[in-house]
Amino acid sequence: MRSSSIFVAIVTCVIACGPSDAQESSPVEQKTGSLSPDKKWQYNCGEYAPGYCYPEILKAGTTERAVDLDQELSVNGPEARDAEILWAPDSKRFGFNYSPPHAHHTRFTTVAFYQLRGDKWVALRQLPDYLLRRRSDYLPKGFNPRQCVREWDELKLREWTDANTAILYAPCHGRSSDLPAAFLLTLKFDDVGNWKIIKAHQMSKKELEEEQ
């Protein structure tokens, strides 16, 4: 009789405790790529209220903070949960896609890059806002930047092709929520972290349809 009671208690605990533990885990912490390739650094977005978290880089396996992304980039609140980190293959750089403070009637997403110097992470030169609206030699001559609305500015790191080369996604959003154009920009870094856009691929109509 006693063994039957123990069995029932164990089953009850498994059913009751299992979902509770899963709900306590932060969805941001489970994102793929939060751990650097060399497994020395960890991206974390610690929840301080339901739906709110503060992003940071920790030394893996510890609570020691290496970069306070909340403090440095003013990214917090519910939009911080949508932020994303992509590590360079050698773990010496990372790109952080996030939404900084902006007016409520606008949408603004950009990327910040950091580089490891010694044992310290240093912020690199920020990419300019409204990148597609600026006159640039790398954009095709037939492209009209005026078709891109100022109320929706988006620039995201898509992937690292090697330790010094990043591919950025830069869409041009139109006034009627359409996507008249989008570009994949190739960003090249030198040893000290200076970057330069060396190529701009205008996405085809088929590629745009796949994005939408």
Enumerate the predicted regions with their spans.
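Extracellular-facing segments of soluble proteins and assemblies that are Gly/Ser/Thr-biased and enriched
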Residues: 81-119
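Acidic, small-residue rich beta-repeat scaffolds with periodic aromatic anchors
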Residues: 12-34, 48, 109-212
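Bacterial N-terminal signal peptides that target proteins for export
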Residues: 1-7
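Short consensus segments that form the blades of beta-propeller domains
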Residues: 45-49, 74-76, 100-106, 175-179
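Compositionally biased, low-complexity segments
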Residues: 1, 13-16, 87
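Short N-terminal edge-element motif at the start of the domain
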Residues: 28-89
